């Protein structure tokens, strides 16, 4: 069965290829076309590329605000990916009832640097902490009542 299927597909493929070669070679080619064709094709490609590049440049200028918004979304997606990678660490810290202040001390992050550019791990844990402390189960826990970061 497999041999029959393979041979049938091979025959069909060879016949289709043979028909394509016959159709492609029906037109006679002159010596002038043979010599001039690559040059003309090159110029047409360059001209069409220039027209295409001008159109895309105009479109890019019009869509620059959309591109900036997309870049911001991509950066947010990257940061969410990093936070997803660190989720087990966040869960461990939360199970140890660590506040964001405890995490900051464990990561040896000074407070003055957090105001300028917070660590992604620390800011991810703060977000994780806020979300999980809003759950009914943890709402009244003493470590969730601390709001000092």
From Swiss-Prot:
One GO location term (cellular component): extracellular region
User: Secreted as a keyword?
Assistant: yes
Q: Where is the signal peptide?
A: 1-24
Highest taxon above the source species: Eukaryota
Primary location group: secreted
> What upregulates or represses it?
Expression is up-regulated at later stages of infection.
| Cell location | Secreted; Host cytoplasm; Host nucleus
Q: Identify the keywords attached in UniProt to this record, alphabetized.
A: Host cytoplasm, Host nucleus, Secreted, Signal, Virulence
List the ranges annotated as motif RxLR-dEER.
Answer: 52-78
Signal among keywords: yes
Q: In UniProt terms, what function does this protein have?
A: Effector that acts as a broad suppressor of cell death to interrupt plant immunity. Inhibits cell death induced by cell death-inducing proteins, including the PAMP elicitor INF1 from P.infestans.
Q: What is recorded about the protein's domains?
A: The RxLR-dEER motif acts to carry the protein into the host cell cytoplasm through binding to cell surface phosphatidylinositol-3-phosphate.
| Protein name from the UniProt record | Secreted RxLR effector protein 17
